[in-house]
């Protein structure tokens, strides 16, 4: 899917950087200093999605990578960010408000504690192994859902017998799974 960045993307990125720096000084939620690499990594995953999702879930959203950047470039997608850590959820809310991202809902809980709903896309970045991600997202996907997991070098070992397409960019491996392959 070819995505066009919104006109105010650079301003939003600058504002996000300020939010992260300010919040991080007090709460130490991440150790990333180079946002450009994180942004590129976050957006790279969209190259492997062929249809525009209406509803998306990000599991373990942390400091907002990749979810905040994906929400910026997919403004018509309703994003549900699940983050059980209260400090990190507070940061996500702070960033959402400052960036005026009306397409984001923050859930300060584990996904498995939420009432299920079906998403078109489920993302996660380095939270846990792929089978565990699928297990905890049970009830949130159907045969049409796509899973886009931002993984590292052990992704093939994690997948086991699960069917997935793996795309590589530098050190990152993106695992794309289809709901009909995991249902």
From Swiss-Prot:
The UniProt entry lists the main location of this chain as cytoplasm
Q: Which reaction does it catalyse?
A: guanosine(527) in 16S rRNA + S-adenosyl-L-methionine = N(7)-methylguanosine(527) in 16S rRNA + S-adenosyl-L-homocysteine
* Positions bound to S-adenosyl-L-methionine: 60, 65, 111-112, 125
Keywords, A to Z, come to: Cytoplasm, Methyltransferase, rRNA processing, S-adenosyl-L-methionine, Transferase
* Gene Ontology annotations for the cellular component aspect, listed alphabetically: cytosol
Compartments (UniProt record) = Cytoplasm
**Alphabetized InterPro entries for the sequence:** rRNA_ssu_MeTfrase_G, SAM-dependent_MTases_sf
Q: Does the keyword Zinc apply?
A: no
UniProt EC number: 2.1.1.170
List the SUPFAM superfamilies hit by this protein, alphabetically.
S-adenosyl-L-methionine-dependent methyltransferases (SSF53335)
- NCBIfam families, A to Z: rsmG_gidB
Family indicated by similarity: Belongs to the methyltransferase superfamily. RNA methyltransferase RsmG family.
User: What does the function comment of this entry state?
Assistant: Specifically methylates the N7 position of guanine in position 527 of 16S rRNA.
Instruction: List the HAMAP family hit by this protein, alphabetically.
Output: 16SrRNA_methyltr_G
Q: What is this protein called?
A: Ribosomal RNA small subunit methyltransferase G
| Species, as recorded | Campylobacter hominis (strain ATCC BAA-381 / DSM 21671 / CCUG 45161 / LMG 19568 / NCTC 13146 / CH001A)
């Amino acid at each position: 899917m070819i995505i066009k960045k919104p006109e105010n993307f650079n301003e939003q990125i600058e504002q996000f950087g300020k939010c992260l720096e300010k919040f991080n000084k007090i709460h130490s939620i991440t150790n990333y200093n180079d946002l450009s690499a994180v942004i590129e990594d976050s957006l790279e995953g969209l190259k492997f999605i062929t249809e525009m999702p209406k509803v998306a879930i990000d599991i373990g959203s942390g400091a907002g990578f990749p979810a905040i950047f994906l929400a910026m470039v997919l403004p018509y997608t309703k994003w549900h960010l699940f983050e059980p850590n209260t400090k990190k959820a507070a940061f996500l809310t702070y960033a959402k408000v400052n960036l005026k991202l009306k397409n984001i809902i923050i859930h300060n809980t584990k996904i498995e504690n939420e009432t299920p709903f079906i998403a078109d896309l489920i993302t996660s970045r380095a939270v846990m192994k792929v089978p565990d991600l699928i297990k905890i997202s049970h009830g949130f996907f159907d045969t049409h859902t796509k899973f886009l997991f931002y993984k590292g070098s052990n992704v093939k070992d994690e997948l086991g017998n699960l069917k997935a397409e793996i795309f590589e960019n530098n050190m990152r491996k993106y695992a794309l799974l289809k709901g009909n392959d995991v249902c």
